[in-house]
Swiss-Prot record:
The organism's place on the tree of life at top rank: Archaea
Species this protein is from: Archaeoglobus fulgidus (strain ATCC 49558 / DSM 4304 / JCM 9628 / NBRC 100126 / VC-16)
Alphabetized UniProt keyword annotations: DNA-binding
Keyword Protease: no
Residues of the signal peptide: none
Protein name per its UniProtKB record: Ferric uptake regulation protein homolog
Family membership noted in the UniProt record: Belongs to the Fur family.
InterPro entries referenced in this protein's UniProt entry, alphabetically: FUR (IPR002481), WH-like_DNA-bd_sf (IPR036388), WH_DNA-bd_sf (IPR036390)
Length: 128
């Protein structure tokens, strides 16, 4: 689903769907839901395109971001890819990051803070 949307947005923007961009789209479709680091995305792409530079990868990710297809967030000093661009929570527990959507709670946070919320990162630890 994300792949089709990405290809459609690129077409609407008049951008070429090069083999490298297609591979990047496929990688994000495959691993984007687990909020990969930029390094993890790069490592997947260079398996098929070993000559692609990190700079080229990042430039294309910025294009995708400009098209509203993804965003970035930083966690523990590493930039991660966020494919869910709707307001939500990233629930972070140990090594796992899960999306959690609660529109009512987001609305309450927005009312209390007087801000529009894009994403809230929540770090969880067990009580025991």
């Amino acid at each position: 689903m994300w792949k089709e949307r990405a290809m459609e947005e690129m077409k609407k923007a008049g951008l070429r769907l090069t083999p490298q961009r297609l591979k990047l789209i496929e990688v994000i479709e495959k691993i984007g839901g687990r909020h990969p680091t930029l390094k993890e995305v790069y490592e997947e792409v260079v398996k098929e395109f070993p000559t692609m530079s990190f700079s080229t990868l990042y430039s294309n990710l910025l294009i995708f971001r400009g098209l509203g297809l993804l965003d970035f967030f930083t966690l523990e000093g590493e930039t991660r890819v966020e494919v869910n661009c709707e307001p939500h929570f990233n629930v972070i527990e140990r090594e796992e990051i899960r999306d959690f959507v609660d529109e009512e709670l987001i609305g309450e946070i927005e009312r209390r803070l007087g801000r529009n919320v894009k994403v809230v990162n929540v770090f969880m630890e067990d009580r025991d």
